[in-house]
Amino acid sequence: DYNPSGFSFHENKNRNSYAVSLSFSQVLNKKMQLSVFVDFLQQQGLLSTPYQRIYFADVADSFINEFQLADDIEQLPDTRFKIPVGARFNYYLNEKFVLRTYYRFYSDDWGISSHTASIELPYKITDRFTVFPMYRYYTQVESKYFAPYEAHLSTEEFYTSDYDLSTFDAHQFGLGVSYTDIFMGAHVWKFGIKNVDLRYNHYSRSDGLEANIVSFGMKFVLDK
């Protein structure tokens, strides 16, 4: 019979995060700007996700009809130390184009390391309208606590099957349109419209996850 006695519920439901950020920015010349940063982040408390279920390889499967019952919920350490290091480089090509690049390396004491690189090329159609194609690449090495479905053993102290903590690559392609009016000629009631931003991104991950993302934003200034 199914006996979920192995379930270890989380007594501590709190989480505290502490961060220190260091950054440096420098205008190299009339066309180039560089900025670098490093962050130190410490998390303490409940870092597991209670709805993530675990199925052990060394425990017999139990079912209710066709539904398999979990052997435990995700168990992860109650501390995590993260260090991301990155840089941004912007290059003014001409009055129409600006090249924007970004790179970040990330590492933590759960065994995850990752690289992120992105490029954006805004094109100024008019004084007010800009389009900006972009591309972002992400690659990650899995946590030492990750294993897929029915690969963990019940003797392990920590375990997760959350694929956000697995090894994967991801690509993101996008296109955006921005309207900017520093003089706020257009109004909505008592608010002057300063900026309108519309973006579409397609996200694709090597583990099969696909997403289409549309975002819309507006900046207003209250008329006096």
Regions found by a protein language model. Give the residues of each.
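Short beta-strand-to-coil "C-cap" segments at the C-terminal boundary of structured domains/repeats
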Residues: M218-K224
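Outer membrane beta-barrel transmembrane domains
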Residues: L41, L47-T79, P84-R88, S107-S118, ...
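Solenoidal tandem-repeat scaffolds enriched in leucines and small polar residues
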Residues: D1-R53
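General secondary-structure edge motif
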Residues: P4, N12, N16, L69-A70, ...
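Face-selective signature of the C-terminal outer-membrane beta-barrel domain
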Residues: V27-V38, F81-Y92, F97-Y102, N195-N201
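Outer-membrane beta-barrel channels and translocator barrels
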Residues: V27-K31, N94-K96, T126-R128, I182-M184, ...
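Generic detector of bulky aromatic hydrophobic side chains
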Residues: D1-N3, S8, A19, S23, ...
